[in-house]
Regions:
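Basic, Gly/Ser/Thr-rich N-terminal segments that form RNA-phosphate-binding interfaces in CRISPR RAMP
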Residues: 1-143
Length: 143
């Protein structure tokens, strides 16, 4: 897949997401947006010898993920969306997550993501998963 095909694919996905909306008020029209353009950005590719990652999203570390770093935790009280929101049990179990903006030292290469998908998060709906992956950005921390 060429870069231009990837960018077009990504733009199409964001346009669809923009029409659908994001967040808990999307059913009332909140969270919608328009995509005016997408350009490739290599801002994070120019980091020399990264030894840590910055998480751009809240996440739950997977076994074996780095533990040394600076971070804050939060409790996410999730609610199901779409057709599940109207069920008798629309809430997810509370989930302890690492907040976006956290930084963790790594040994070796920085991976594209950390964390994992959480199963058994909605008692009445075992098919529901909670996205708990970190979008990681390589950074260089001083010793």
């Amino acid at each position: 897949m060429t870069d231009s095909v990837r960018l077009q694919w990504l733009a199409d996905l964001f346009r669809l997401l923009g029409r659908t909306g994001l967040g808990k008020r999307k059913s009332t029209g909140k969270g919608s947006f328009d995509v005016t353009g997408i350009d490739k950005c290599n801002l994070f590719e120019a980091i020399d010898n990264p030894n840590a990652f910055l998480s751009l999203s809240n996440f739950v570390p997977a076994p074996g993920d780095p533990t040394e770093g600076n971070y804050r935790v939060m409790v996410k009280y999730g609610k199901l969306g779409e057709e599940f929101a109207l069920s008798k049990h629309p809430f997810k179990h509370p989930l302890l997550m690492i907040q976006a903006g956290s930084v963790f030292r790594v040994q070796g290469m920085v991976r594209a993501y950390y964390g994992y998908m959480i199963e058994d998060i909605a008692p009445a709906h075992p098919e529901v998963l909670q996205y708990a992956l970190a979008f990681s950005v390589p950074v260089r921390l001083e010793a």
